[in-house]
Amino acid sequence: MKLVWRARALADLESLMSYIAERSEPAAERLQAAIEACASGLTQHPFLYRPGRVEGTREAVVHPNYILIYRVGAETVEIVRVVHSRQQYP
């Protein structure tokens, strides 16, 4: 399967990393590595995580505070959002 990041998910990730890096660069690097590792693992096990709150999505809890929202297609796993667990979503 191919991994695809939607523009909104990339913007979420960039904003999140910028915010965390202002406070701690090492923490931002660790979180980004965890998010990227989780995302790449989705190509091997796309149904490992729970069904999402939005129909047709799934939610991977990367860290107690951060969730990857994704869709599984025939040939792709599409990351659609990266959200904080306290963020109102959808």
Where are these regions (language model features)?
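Enriched for short, Lys/Arg-rich terminal
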Residues: 66-67, 71-90
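A beta-hairpin/wing motif
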Residues: 57-63
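Absolute protein N-terminus
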Residues: 1-2, 90
